[in-house]
């Protein structure tokens, strides 16, 4: 957290506090906590994928310290849609408290169920759809249809005694959506008639003028490209973009080709989409990868993952000649039906070069309309602001330039400048008597998942440069296997944090007390012990030094 704000004080009686633990000044890790009358409601719980300067990291989670001490206060986790940056961290939250009600649409919950199955977690689901309302303690939620690049997306109105909040989630105003489900702007405008006290609004494309193209415009382009291909066609797209996959299938079948899904997430998501009726394709039009390799090249279309150059994705392995089932040849047509996420340029261009070296023809959005964004452009957001007429605005889901562009749009529609809150992750915004203001900040950092340690959640060393710039505290504890009983004094070591060798002595006593409380609570899982140690040291450092160095806990069982 770059801001230097004190912790927020006690919430004014009857007020509402909004704290984003992720999703601001970044695209990913979306998680927002609402507090009212001592109870909590969470909207979304997603991951961020690591950049090139974060080696050895598979996933980056929201920092959940803010809720770890208040798990029993959580009324529900409510989901806007099923993209990884909104649902990917759910298993890690449910590890802390498995019975948190998880509220979402049919398709979103189906994806969450698949994800949680990998972690042997069975969530408590509450399925909703647009037009419905649910009550969760002191919070009432109403759901609005939203058009986005994955099915069944929702915007969420949260009604509290402090006022009405509208969270758009990821939103677009496609007037010709392939699934026939446009964003419910009339419903949100009716909400504006009764008064929206705070709008949390998607900022992703706020700096792009005008209105974004419709998803329906991609289909004809894909049809033209497949029709003109003499050999095999491989289309890469996001595994959650069911409307895109449907258009690829429709074009392939119309041109006499059969379709095969490639990549674990693509196969899984399309299976779920078919089961729930979101994807329509006959069994006779689908083939497995092995059968696809035996067919004439001009009789097949492969739909695969790997649009962002992920090293282990299906397309990347094809480009390196390492895919166990598919061997690319000169004359294959590769269509990258996606946007280029900032930070992935080097990886994507590397895959394109490798494909070109093989002799394949590569088509991206730069050559033909093979992709459109799932986020509203500036002109669409103006429709939203003029319809909802919010009293206060908190731009979310975007980098600083996107957030500021969104703030400018809000101001242009008459929202007072002092009512537009440009917050950061960890910054608390209080809504009291219809007025929103920043009240302080809670410590937040990045929580890393290292795939080499299955299910491990914690801060890990990313490299000497990052350690020296941020500082870190390494904590080693030795406990008896099966009981969690400490067998030696905790050892703490810091670097880039404090030069005083005695600076961490109070933290040692804090860790000893935490270990004793964990033993008393019969906590024996080393992951839970590590989480408790990290939380304790992080809280002590934050309170004592107002710093957030990396906390690296190691639990040794003997």
From Swiss-Prot:
The gene is rnj. HAMAP family: RNase_J_bact (MF_01491). This is Ribonuclease J. SMART domains: Lactamase_B. The keyword Cytoplasm applies. It comes from Mycobacterium tuberculosis (strain ATCC 25618 / H37Rv). Substrate binds at residues 371-375. Its cofactor is Zn(2+). Its EC number is 3.1.-.-, 3.5.2.6. Residues 451-558 are annotated as: Required for beta-lactamase activity. Both beta-lactamase and RNase activities are inhibited by chaperone DnaJ2. One of its GO terms (molecular function) is beta-lactamase activity.
């Amino acid at each position: 957290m770059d801001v230097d704000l004190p912790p927020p004080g006690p919430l004014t009686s009857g007020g509402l506090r909004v704290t984003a633990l992720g999703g601001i000044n970044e695209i990913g890790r979306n998680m927002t906590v609402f507090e009212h009358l001592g109870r909590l409601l969470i909207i979304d719980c997603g991951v961020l994928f690591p950049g090139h300067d974060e080696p050895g990291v598979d996933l980056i989670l929201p920092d959940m310290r803010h809720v770890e001490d208040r798990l029993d206060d959580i009324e529900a986790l409510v989901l806007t849609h099923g993209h990884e940056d909104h649902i990917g961290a759910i298993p890690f939250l449910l590890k802390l408290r498995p019975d948190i009600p998880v509220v979402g649409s049919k398709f979103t919950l189906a994806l969450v169920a698949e994800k949680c199955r990998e972690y042997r977690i069975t969530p408590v689901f509450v399925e909703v759809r647009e037009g419905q309302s649910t009550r969760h303690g002191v919070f009432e939620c109403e759901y609005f249809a939203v058009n986005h690049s994955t099915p069944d997306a929702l915007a969420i109105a949260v009604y509290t005694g402090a006022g009405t909040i509208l969270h758009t989630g990821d939103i677009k105003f496609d007037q010709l959506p392939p699934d026939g489900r446009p964003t419910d702007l009339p419903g949100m405008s009716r909400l504006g008639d009764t008064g929206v006290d705070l709008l949390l609004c998607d900022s992703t494309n706020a700096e792009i003028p005008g209105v974004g193209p419709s998803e329906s415009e991609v289909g004809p382009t894909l049809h033209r490209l497949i029709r003109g291909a003499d050999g095999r066609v491989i289309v890469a797209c996001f595994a959650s973009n069911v409307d895109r996959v449907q258009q690829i299938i429709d074009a392939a079948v119309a041109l006499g080709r059969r379709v095969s899904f490639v990549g674990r997430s693509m196969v899984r998501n399309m299976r779920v989409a078919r089961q729930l009726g979101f994807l329509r394709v006959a069994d006779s039009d689908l083939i497995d990868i092995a059968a696809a390799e035996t067919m004439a090249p001009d009789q097949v279309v492969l739909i695969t993952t790997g649009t962002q150059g992920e090293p282990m994705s299906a397309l990347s392995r094809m480009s390196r000649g390492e895919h166990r089932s598919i061997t690319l040849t000169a004359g294959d047509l590769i269509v990258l039906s996606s946007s280029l996420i900032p930070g992935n340029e080097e990886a994507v261009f590397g895959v394109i070069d490798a494909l070109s070296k093989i002799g394949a023809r590569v088509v991206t959005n730069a050559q033909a309309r093979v992709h459109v964004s799932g986020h509203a452009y500036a002109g669409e957001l103006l429709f939203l602001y003029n319809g909802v007429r919010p009293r206060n605005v908190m731009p979310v889901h975007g980098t600083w330039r996107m957030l500021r562009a969104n703030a400018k749009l809000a101001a242009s529609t008459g929202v007072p400048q002092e009512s537009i809150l440009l917050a950061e992750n960890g910054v608390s915004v209080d809504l009291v008597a219809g007025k929103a203001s920043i009240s302080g900040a809670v410590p937040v950092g990045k929580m890393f998942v290292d795939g080499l340690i299955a299910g491990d959640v914690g801060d890990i060393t990313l490299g000497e440069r990052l350690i020296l710039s941020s500082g870190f505290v390494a904590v080693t504890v030795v406990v008896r296997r099966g009981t969690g009983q400490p067998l030696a004094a905790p050892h703490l070591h810091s670097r880039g944090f404090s030069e005083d060798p005695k600076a961490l002595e109070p933290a040692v006593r804090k860790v000893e007390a935490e270990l004793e409380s964990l033993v008393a609570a019969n906590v024996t899982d080393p992951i839970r012990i590590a989480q408790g140690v990290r939380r304790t040291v992080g809280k002590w450092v934050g309170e004592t030094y107002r710093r957030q160095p990396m906390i690296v806990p190691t639990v040794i069982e003997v």
